[in-house]
């Protein structure tokens, strides 16, 4: 069996949190770290190797240049242009981050990369589309973490309100990984029942779905302002997506995908439900949205396309 290899490009907070999650779940044989700060990345390599030594089996933690990537299965891009300033949004990061990515991806393609790109760098949807354009790879092999973390937060919030397991909840967020994202309540259910039907039966009252959706959207910014970064949640998101790709789980996750006619749109990447396989995105699930959700999706598309046009 071919050893499974993941390269993490950017060994900052998100990259190292993802690396630690990979070590704990240990379903890859080699974890490769890439960072411009050679001293820091070597320190992280040693620290992670120590952590891996406590786990069963063998896992190699190595350091390479990004261009040394011909044998890599999944390349995770977590590079950042630096911390957000007060009042900035994810979209404010675009220009500086775009310049960094435009220097990395062509070098990787020259180095023979033929795997799958997973983008966690913000603004996720715009950078995912940029990486697809730069790489020349089929669109199914370039995806972003998108709104899978936001979807998971939504499920966690509902689970806490209802005192049930988050895995029992089918609820989704679609759109931009940012301010214009929205919950798809028309396709959300708990044990096969609409969310508020179940809530009325269990609690005797409806949940404030609007507030729950807003909380799911805003949690990332709250974490950032409280501790200076987000790392563990997105790190876990990266590892879960990779696990479903390697296993060929055929499970649908709301990740950022390049659209080509789905939802009547093209020329962008956006968070939608997608079935994952060992080749990346096997199928994009087109949900029939209600009128309000269609308007929200169109707004999110407009936000993303405006940013894409600026790079």
Curated annotation (Swiss-Prot):
A GO molecular function term, named singly, is: L-lactate dehydrogenase activity
Q: In which pathway does it act?
A: Fermentation; pyruvate fermentation to lactate; (S)-lactate from pyruvate: step 1/1
- According to its UniProt record, where is this protein mainly located? cytoplasm
EC main class here is oxidoreductase
User: Which EC number(s) does the record attach to this protein?
Assistant: 1.1.1.27
A Pfam match is: Ldh_1_C
Task: Mention any one GO cellular component term assigned to this protein in its UniProt record.
Answer: cytoplasm
Task: Check the record and name the PROSITE patterns matching this protein.
Answer: L_LDH
Against PANTHER family, the record matches this protein to: L-2-HYDROXYCARBOXYLATE DEHYDROGENASE (NAD(P)(+)), L-LACTATE DEHYDROGENASE
* Role played: Catalyzes the conversion of lactate to pyruvate.
Q: Which family does it belong to?
A: Belongs to the LDH/MDH superfamily. LDH family.
Write the protein's name: L-lactate dehydrogenase 2
Protein's organism: Listeria monocytogenes serovar 1/2a (strain ATCC BAA-679 / EGD-e)
């Amino acid at each position: 069996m071919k050893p499974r290899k993941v390269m993490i490009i950017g060994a900052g907070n998100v990259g190292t949190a993802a690396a630690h999650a990979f070590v704990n779940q240990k379903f890859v044989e080699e974890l490769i770290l890439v960072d411009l700060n050679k001293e820091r990345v070597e320190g992280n390599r040693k620290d992670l190797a120590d952590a891996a030594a406590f786990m069963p089996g063998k896992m190699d933690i190595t350091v390479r240049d990004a261009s040394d990537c011909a044998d890599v299965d999944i390349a995770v891009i977590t590079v950042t242009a630096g911390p957000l300033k007060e009042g900035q949004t994810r979209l404010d990061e675009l220009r500086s981050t775009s310049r960094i990515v435009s220097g990395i991806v062509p070098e990787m393609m020259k180095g023979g990369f033929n795997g799958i790109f997973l983008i966690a760098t913000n603004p996720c949807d715009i950078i995912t589309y940029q990486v697809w354009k730069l790489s020349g790879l089929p669109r199914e092999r370039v995806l972003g973490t998108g709104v899978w973390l936001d979807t998971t937060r939504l499920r966690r919030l509902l689970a806490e309100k209802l005192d049930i397991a988050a895995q029992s909840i089918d609820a989704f967020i679609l759109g931009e990984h940012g301010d214009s994202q929205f919950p798809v309540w028309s396709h959300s259910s708990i044990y096969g029942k609409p969310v508020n039907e179940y809530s009325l039966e269990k609690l005797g009252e409806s949940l404030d779905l609007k507030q729950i959706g807003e909380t799911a959207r805003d949690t990332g910014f709250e974490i950032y302002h409280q501790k200076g970064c987000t790392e563990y949640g997105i790190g876990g998101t990266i590892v879960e997506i990779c696990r479903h790709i390697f296993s060929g789980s055929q499970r649908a996750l709301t990740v950022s995908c390049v659209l080509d006619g789905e939802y009547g749109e093209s020329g962008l990447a956006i968070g939608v439900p997608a079935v994952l396989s060992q080749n990346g995105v096997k199928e994009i699930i087109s949900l029939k949205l209600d009128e309000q959700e269609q308007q929200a999706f169109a707004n999110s598309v407009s936000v993303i396309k405006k940013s894409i046009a600026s790079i």
